[in-house]
Curated annotation (Swiss-Prot):
Binding site for [4Fe-4S] cluster: C88, C89, C153, C183
GO cellular component, one term: respiratory chain complex I
Reaction it catalyzes: a ubiquinone + NADH + 5 H(+)(in) = a ubiquinol + NAD(+) + 4 H(+)(out)
UniProt-recorded name of the protein: NADH dehydrogenase [ubiquinone] iron-sulfur protein 7, mitochondrial
Keywords: 4Fe-4S, Electron transport, Iron, Iron-sulfur, Metal-binding, Mitochondrion, NAD, Oxidoreductase, Respiratory chain, Transit peptide, Translocase, Transport, Ubiquinone
Biased composition (Low complexity): 30-42
EC number, as in UniProt: 7.1.1.2
Entries under SUPFAM superfamilies matching the protein: HydA/Nqo6-like
């Protein structure tokens, strides 16, 4: 009898722990136990897709993307480069702007003012004395703006790489988008570089990035 009383007392002391353990779920609930407000059983709105930016719906994303495409079409079809000739590469740049290659058919019109340009073509050797002027002209260009480095001297110093007076690449002064190799590069190479810049402009998503910030 003493043994039975001891076991009954032990079970009485462990009853709260058994009740607490019974409330712990060790398996996933079945579909039949889901509440009526669950998206899986109700006709409410589904959760947003993982590919959609936060805070924007699919129709809004589509409209914003189309506006971005329209802006990119206008920008790549009306590139106005500013002539920044520094050495012999500038002669090839002038050759590219003449009637033989006819850059006007691509909407490319050379402008003498940085405030009317969106692309700067750095053609030639950039010296330490000219570097502040290059940066000042770049800062005067409106956004969005791009830079094309034309020739070996503008890309990395070229023939004068070890000179004390030459900047070893104009990308140390301004950010460069397109590099055109050659010493000097031909007019076809410059045209190819501008076509690559048009592809880069076409991939921009300015409005979508601004909207999702």
């Amino acid at each position: 009898m003493a043994l039975i009383a001891r076991n009954a007392k032990l079970l009485t002391g462990t009853a709260p722990f058994l009740q607490r353990a019974a409330t712990i779920h060790t398996t996933l609930p079945s579909l039949s136990q889901q509440p009526a407000s669950s998206p899986a059983t109700s006709g409410g709105a589904q959760p947003p897709s993982m590919n959609t930016p936060a805070g924007i719906s699919k129709p809004a994303e589509y409209v914003i993307s189309k506006v971005d495409d329209l802006m990119n079409w206008a920008r790549r079809g009306s590139i106005w480069p500013m002539t920044f000739g520094l050495a012999c590469c500038a002669v090839e740049m002038m050759h590219a702007g003449a009637a033989r290659y006819d850059f006007d058919r691509f909407g490319i019109i050379f402008r003498p003012s940085p405030r009317q340009s969106d692309v700067m073509i750095v053609a030639g050797t950039l010296t330490n004395k000219m570097a502040p002027a290059l940066r000042k002209v770049y800062d005067q260009m409106p956004e969005p703006r791009w830079v094309i480095s034309m020739g070996s001297c503008a890309n990395g110093g070229g023939y004068y790489h070890y000179s004390y007076a030459v900047v070893r690449g104009c990308d140390r002064i301004v950010p460069v988008d397109i590099y055109v190799p050659g010493c000097p590069p031909t007019a076809e190479a410059l045209l190819y570089g501008i076509l690559q810049l048009q592809k880069k402009i076409n991939r921009r998503k300015d409005l979508l990035m601004w909207w999702t910030q």
